[in-house]
């Protein structure tokens, strides 16, 4: 699938081998969690209140586009609360017993973090309801007429769920989270701070303007910013003296085919296809997918969100429409309609 090869795809599995570096440069405390000020200020109060009452933090749901720091925030909460965190994901929990095993091994006030929580199976989700509300497990023993239900008490714990699709959560599950936080795309100055901090953690020689160049093209996403930084580092090591100046950063990013707006090949292909083949739209998703040879889910979940958020593309009841801003970006005159 083309999406898997995109350097700027925030959830690109090709770069899983670099997660060790990612963990090394992730912030560990709320004071270092830059760019989500409303989330940080609220979580500081919620965490301090829970500590004052010597209670577990209320269950927390974190949602937003890929790469904005949902897992990072979950680990920060665990560090701030001074508790252990167990991490899993929705697709991994196939049977009720999988979740029951995790829950029964939690210590008091521990955190259970479930990534992609919207992908939990209905059977597993049913187990969560009494666990979240009453700290109890309801388990069926036996089958048929001889079946009986037993209750197992659980230590007080905090469930943190992360998802890119909050709308896909069932209402009963969503309503059981006492705290809900949405992560937004980052501003350029916050991303510049993150890039510079990551460069310092990696002992890189980098000018502030070089960090700014990377931040401008990172699509408002820290994960992409850090990935681009590593590729710029490679370029600087080979093509210069390892020092990252604005000029080196610009040349490296141009080599990577990431333009000044953060668009890569697939972004440009989608926008140009709508402009050149469909006169700017409106055009349906099926036609767009056929025109660029990409899957519909990839277009909706990976390519389009940033283009829409930045005002280059619109989703309407009649289909996709390219905005005047996109025509201006490519230097193309909008056709008269």
Curated annotation (Swiss-Prot):
Xref: NCBIfam families: PRK00080.1, ruvB
Subcellular location: Cytoplasm
Subunit structure, as described in the record: Homohexamer. Forms an RuvA(8)-RuvB(12)-Holliday junction (HJ) complex. HJ DNA is sandwiched between 2 RuvA tetramers; dsDNA enters through RuvA and exits via RuvB. An RuvB hexamer assembles on each DNA strand where it exits the tetramer. Each RuvB hexamer is contacted by two RuvA subunits (via domain III) on 2 adjacent RuvB subunits; this complex drives branch migration. In the full resolvosome a probable DNA-RuvA(4)-RuvB(12)-RuvC(2) complex forms which resolves the HJ.
Native organism taxonomy: Bacteria, Pseudomonadati, Pseudomonadota, Gammaproteobacteria, Vibrionales
UniProt name for this protein: Holliday junction branch migration complex subunit RuvB
Intrachain S-S bonds: none
Residues reported in the UniProt entry to bind DNA: 315, 320
GO BP: any one term: DNA recombination
Free-text note regarding domains: Has 3 domains, the large (RuvB-L) and small ATPase (RuvB-S) domains and the C-terminal head (RuvB-H) domain. The head domain binds DNA, while the ATPase domains jointly bind ATP, ADP or are empty depending on the state of the subunit in the translocation cycle. During a single DNA translocation step the structure of each domain remains the same, but their relative positions change.
Residues holding ATP: 25-26, 67, 70-72, 133-135, 176, 186, 223
GO MF annotation: an example: ATP binding
Organism: Aliivibrio salmonicida (strain LFI1238) (Vibrio salmonicida (strain LFI1238))
Main location: cytoplasm
Annotated region described as Small ATPAse domain (RuvB-S), given as residue ranges: 187-257
Family: Belongs to the RuvB family.
Job of this protein: The RuvA-RuvB-RuvC complex processes Holliday junction (HJ) DNA during genetic recombination and DNA repair, while the RuvA-RuvB complex plays an important role in the rescue of blocked DNA replication forks via replication fork reversal (RFR). RuvA specifically binds to HJ cruciform DNA, conferring on it an open structure. The RuvB hexamer acts as an ATP-dependent pump, pulling dsDNA into and through the RuvAB complex. RuvB forms 2 homohexamers on either side of HJ DNA bound by 1 or 2 RuvA tetramers; 4 subunits per hexamer contact DNA at a time.
Region named Head domain (RuvB-H): 260-337
Catalytic reaction equation(s): ATP + H2O = ADP + phosphate + H(+)
Gene3D superfamilies in the record: 1.10.8.60, P-loop containing nucleotide triphosphate hydrolases, Winged helix-like DNA-binding domain superfamily/Winged helix DNA-binding domain
Region (Large ATPase domain (RuvB-L)): 4-186
Pfam families: AAA_lid_4 (PF17864), RuvB_C (PF05491), RuvB_N (PF05496)
Positions bound to Mg(2+): 71
EC number: 3.6.4.-
Alphabetical list of CDD domains matching this protein: AAA (cd00009)
Keywords linked to the UniProt accession: ATP-binding, Cytoplasm, DNA damage, DNA recombination, DNA repair, DNA-binding, Hydrolase, Nucleotide-binding
């Amino acid at each position: 699938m083309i999406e898997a090869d995109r350097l700027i795809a925030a959830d690109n599995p090709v770069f899983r081998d670099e997660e060790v570096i990612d963990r090394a440069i992730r912030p560990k405390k709320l004071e270092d969690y830059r760019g989500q000020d409303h989330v940080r200020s609220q979580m500081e109060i919620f965490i301090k209140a829970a500590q004052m009452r010597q209670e577990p933090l209320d269950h927390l749901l974190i949602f937003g586009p890929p790469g904005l720091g949902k897992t990072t925030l979950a680990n920060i909460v665990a560090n701030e609360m001074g508790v252990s965190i167990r991490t899993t994901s929705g697709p991994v929990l196939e049977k009720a017993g999988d979740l029951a095993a995790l829950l029964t091994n939690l210590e008091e006030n521990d955190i259970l973090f479930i990534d992609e929580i919207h992908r939990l199976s209905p059977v597993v989700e049913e187990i969560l309801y009494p666990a979240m509300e009453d700290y109890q497990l309801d388990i069926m023993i036996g089958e048929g007429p001889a079946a009986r239900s037993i209750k197992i008490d659980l230590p007080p714990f905090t469930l943190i769920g992360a998802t890119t699709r909050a709308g896909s959560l069932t209402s009963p599950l969503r309503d059981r989270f006492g705290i809900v936080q949405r992560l937004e795309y980052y501003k350029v100055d916050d991303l510049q701070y993150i890039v510079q901090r990551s460069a310092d953690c990696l002992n890189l020689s980098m000018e502030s303007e070089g960090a700014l160049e990377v931040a401008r093209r990172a699509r408002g996403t820290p994960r992409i910013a850090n990935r681009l930084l590593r590729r710029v580092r490679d370029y600087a090591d080979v093509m210069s003296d390892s020092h990252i100046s604005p000029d080196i950063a610009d040349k490296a990013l141009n080599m990577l085919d990431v333009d000044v707006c953060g668009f890569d090949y697939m972004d440009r292909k989608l926008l140009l296809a709508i402009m050149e083949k469909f006169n700017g739209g409106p055009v349906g998703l099926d036609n767009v997918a056929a025109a660029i040879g990409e899957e519909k889910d990839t277009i909706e979940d990976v390519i389009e969100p940033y283009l829409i958020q930045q005002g280059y593309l619109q989703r309407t009841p009649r289909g996709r429409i390219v905005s005047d801003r996109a025509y201006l970006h490519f230097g193309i005159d909008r056709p008269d309609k």
